């Protein structure tokens, strides 16, 4: 954990009890609202202590990320994972969360270091509607489906985009919410 947290705390609820709604107003988890961008401390207070995975950013990647997120925005990339909940997030500076993710299936070919040990087992909705139904109104972008939602963008990554007649046929690996670019 790199010594990020002095005291480890568990989430005050189980993965099955986790209820998440994504809306134009942010993310609501078990009745408590979080914005994206949000300081890590707010997420820790709500979800418990995560596991951290630090990433070295090579110069090409840093240049791309700074073009996207602003000069100096990429200083200490750390992804955090709440293994028991199936939730993860991305930071560019180790403290400000710019993307939340909910993992439904972990593609072994990707071998993501920050993939949760358990998959998300709670309830996920978009504007109160089941996410699988709502995301279909988004744009099909070959390997993901993207749904604009006010200042946010919700993306769902296909498990097997080329395995059926429709990319949605193979299911999804994860759903992420971030500020729209």
Regions found by a protein language model. Give the residues of each.
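Short helix/turn-capping signatures at newly exposed starts of structured segments
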Residues: 2-181
């Amino acid at each position: 954990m790199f010594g990020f947290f002095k005291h480890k705390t568990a989430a005050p609820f189980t993965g099955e009890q986790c209820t998440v709604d994504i809306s134009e107003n942010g993310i609501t988890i078990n009745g408590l609202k979080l914005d994206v961008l949000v300081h890590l401390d707010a997420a820790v207070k709500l979800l418990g202590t995560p596991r951290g995975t630090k990433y070295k950013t090579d110069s090409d990647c840093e240049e791309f990320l700074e073009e996207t997120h602003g000069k100096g925005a990429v200083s200490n990339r750390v992804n955090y994972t709440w293994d028991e909940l199936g939730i993860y997030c991305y930071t560019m500076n180790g403290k400000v969360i710019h993307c939340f993710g909910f993992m439904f299936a972990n593609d072994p070919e990707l071998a993501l270091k920050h993939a949760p040990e358990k998959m998300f087992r709670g309830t996920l909705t978009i504007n109160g509607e089941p996410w699988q139904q709502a995301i279909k109104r988004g744009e099909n972008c070959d390997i993901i489906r993207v749904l604009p939602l006010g200042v946010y963008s919700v993306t769902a990554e296909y498990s097997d985009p080329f395995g059926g007649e429709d990319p949605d046929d193979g299911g999804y690996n994860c759903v992420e919410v971030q500020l729209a670019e």
